[in-house]
Regions:
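Juxtamembrane intracellular "pre-TM" segments in multi-pass secondary transporters
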Residues: 2-17, 213-244, 423-426
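Transmembrane alpha-helix termini and helix-breaking/packing motifs in multi-pass membrane transporters
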Residues: 44, 49, 77-81, 104-113, ...
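Helix-to-loop junctions at the C-terminal end of transmembrane segments
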Residues: 71-84, 180-181, 288-300, 385
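Intracellular juxtamembrane helix-capping segments at the cytosolic ends
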Residues: 135-150, 341-355
């Protein structure tokens, strides 16, 4: 037993730098994909050209959140007894790219064949759903692979790759602004979506390049413990408290799809400002990610979640209290802080809460627990914005964001340093 485990750990260390590089490259490409297909700026701007419904605008981040959430428990159970998992990662990643390809082809063919607005929206939402449902199956396998192949300095990996990806994303943000300013909508959007597609293919090459080390039987969870393990997750009181307050924090998403649209509508600025907003969003993420990675490794990722909630709440209040263009620039910087902080923390905090062998299960439970709010919040935001206006939307987001910050600060103990120690929190 000890020999097999020692050989496994040796292979992990041998492949550590190789996997670190390719995982970092994959994560860097995420910035290009996310900027070119942002559910908070680019996609709402695209869909708005075909509908006046703010509810449909709110559906964009809803499908993004729900699609990446609901399949995770299914995938975690599927992976439970499977030793070789990389092949599933590659197959699902390829499916994700089919959704991105579909949106790209739609933007290219819609003006050429004069496809109706209704059919355009149907095809768009089908492709958008395909991409993010595939992401829901992908995430547990990816996090499990990450936890095994990168056993140390994960915060540094995310920090440095997000930083470099964000810097390159600044150039992309400038390009987005240039395209939207100088070229008609129907010419600019295929280029933007094409860049996202190209980045996704580089990401796919990175995923294929990862080296899987198959664990020995001794390190696999026993089938007899499967049901008990799921029950044990819910007996982890600290983790449950985290899920409750982190779930409320999702309400910050009520505002994010509408910041760019409200700026265009209220301030009467040009469409090129969507590219500027996206650039600021990328710059904020690039600037903050190294700090998040360092702080998470040192102090724990709960601290980053708290700071992110504060940034998101301040952004919402600023948008409603000081509706000027410079203020909106600050709003998007704060939103970038929030999104990057929550993104890097939502993954890495699982390793702090979970015993090593239960990471996919903890991941799935975490995401499933956040689904009810994450599924309705952007749609609720669309209803509020349509019926009561953007201001009511932003007041609600800011107030609930602050409430979640106070709750998580009071009720959740920092799990840093206690990974795998116990399932029940004191």
């Amino acid at each position: 037993m000890h020999t097999a485990v020692a050989e496994y750990n040796q292979k992990i260390n041998t492949n550590y730098r190789w996997n670190f590089f390719w995982m970092a490259l994959d994560n860097m490409m995420f910035f290009f994909i996310f900027m070119g297909m942002s559910p908070y700026t680019i996609l709402p701007y695209y869909v708005e050209k075909f509908t006046d419904s703010k509810i449909l605008i709110g559906l964009i981040p809803t499908l993004y959140l729900v699609g990446t959430t609901l399949p995770q428990l299914v995938m975690a159970n599927f992976l439970h007894s499977r030793k070789k998992r990389k092949k599933y990662l590659v197959a699902i990643a390829a499916t994700q790219r089919m959704g991105i390809l579909g949106v790209f082809l739609l933007s290219l063919l819609q003006p050429r064949f004069n496809i109706s607005a209704t059919l355009t929206l149907v095809i768009f939402f089908l492709m958008h759903t395909l991409q993010h449902v595939a992401s829901g199956f992908y995430v547990p396998a990816w996090i499990d692979f990450l936890g095994k192949c990168i056993p140390r300095r994960r915060g540094f990996l995310f920090g440095i790759s997000n930083f470099l990806g964000g810097l390159m994303g600044l150039a992309l943000g400038w390009l987005l602004a240039f395209l939207l300013e100088r070229y008609p909508f129907q010419q600019a959007m295929p280029v933007i979506f094409g860049i996202a597609l190209g980045a996704s293919l580089i990401s796919l090459v990175s995923i294929i390049s990862w080296r899987e080390v198959v664990p020995p039987d001794e390190l696999l969870p026993r089938e007899a413990d499967r049901t008990d393990s799921l029950g044990g997750v819910f007996k982890d009181r600290n983790f449950v408290q985290y899920l409750i307050w982190r779930g409320l924090m999702v309400t910050l998403e009520i505002a994010t799809p509408f910041y760019a649209l409200s700026a265009l509508e209220i301030l009467r600025v040009s469409a090129a400002q969507v590219g500027v907003f996206t650039t600021i969003l990328a710059f904020s993420q690039a600037a903050m990610n190294p700090l998040w990675g360092w702080l998470g490794d040192k102090k724990g990722f709960l601290r980053i979640i708290q700071i992110s909630a504060l940034a998101g709440s301040l952004g919402a209040f600023l948008a409603v209290l000081v509706p000027t263009l410079p203020s909106y620039y600050a709003v998007f910087f704060l939103v970038g802080m929030m999104l990057s902080g929550l993104s890097i923390s939502s993954i890495n905090i699982i390793f702090e809460f979970s015993p090593k062998q239960l990471v996919p299960l903890y991941t799935a439970v975490s995401q499933i627990a956040l689904t009810p709010l994450s599924s309705v919040v952007p749609l609720l935001g669309g209803v509020v914005a349509e019926q009561l206006g953007y201001a009511a939307n932003y007041w609600l987001a800011g107030a609930l964001g602050l409430a979640s910050l106070l709750g998580i600060s009071a009720a959740v103990k920092n799990p840093k340093g206690h990974s795998g120690e116990e399932l029940k929190a004191a």
